Amino acid sequence: MRRLSSVALALLLVAPASAEAASQRLLVNGDSLAVGTKRYIPRELEDWRIRQSTAVSRHAYQGADVMRSYGASLPRVIHVSLGTNDDPNQVAGFRAAVDEVMEVAGEERCVVWANIVRPPVAGKSYAGYNRALARESLERDNLRIVNWARMVRRHPEWLSDDGVHVSAEGYRARAKAVARRVRRCGS
């Protein structure tokens, strides 16, 4: 009888951890950079259930619709990798896309968004997009930024000739940084 009580107690102590692990769900919503990290994110978040909706050339304005398509099953944590394919002259449009993503997420979900690295388009840099993300994150407790721009500045050897995509080492590092932020959601 004493042994049975010990087993029952052990099961009770383990049950909450299992329930917590099952509730750790992530949606990756992104462009070609998310395609690049697709194989590495699950390695960094082995105890998470991960869904990935990635498409080369996906735009920021498409992000909210991707999230809406999940309906009530939208995970509590969402990683967004969008903005790289958008016109840097349209900061207001990007800001509107960020607002729409955050509106769909609601206040109960955590959004982890990687800021943007790419060469200027028509002489305009993406600094305005990164400032918009930084400002939004100051106003919203549930928006966390992965400072991809800083990471790439520290490791320019990761960049490919197009100045956007990176080596396998760069994608692994990006996945690790995303995973660190994802794990902090809820804390």
Residues of each region from the PLM?
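Conserved beta-strand termini and adjacent loop/short-helix elements that scaffold enzyme active sites
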Residues: 53-55, 114, 146-151
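Conserved SGNH/GDSL esterase-like catalytic core that processes O-acyl groups on lipids
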Residues: 22-100, 119-128
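A short helix->loop->beta-strand "cap" motif at the edges of active sites that frequently abuts
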Residues: 106-110
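Sec/Tat signal peptide C-region and signal peptidase I cleavage site
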Residues: 17-21
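Bacterial N-terminal signal peptides
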Residues: 6-16
